[in-house]
Amino acid sequence: MTEMTMWEKPGAPPTKSTGTTVNKMVLGGRYQESSNTGTMMGMPFEGHGTLAYDNAKKVFENSWVDNMGTGVMYMSGPWDAATKSITLLGKMTDPASLTEKDFREVFKVIDDNTQLMEMYGPGYDGKEMKMMELKFTRKK
């Protein structure tokens, strides 16, 4: 089960919804492919991600596409063993302003059955804010 929480602006009440995420290892176990379905802001949501560890660069790399837009988000970052997390940094084109914006994603392993993803990006004032949180719980 995936619990989604989204914030439109700092201090505003969040929007919550649920969905399903299916992860599978592909191409000889080199890549994790994620398929996500649910509702977001009252609309059907579908997204696909690919996460991999680049042995040459020594970082994780992630790509993401969904039905809320037409762009592809690319992010990369290191694993932190002390916090059991990956901090991914990347850019995405804002469809409203047609300018590239910085985004940050923190992906944490809570335990064997729970993972947490937090997405940060620019708010209306241009300052970084927490935009989304996804809590993934393994189906038993």
Describe each PLM feature range.
Residues M1-K140:
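Hydrophobic small-molecule pocket/channel-lining residues, especially in calycin-type beta-barrels
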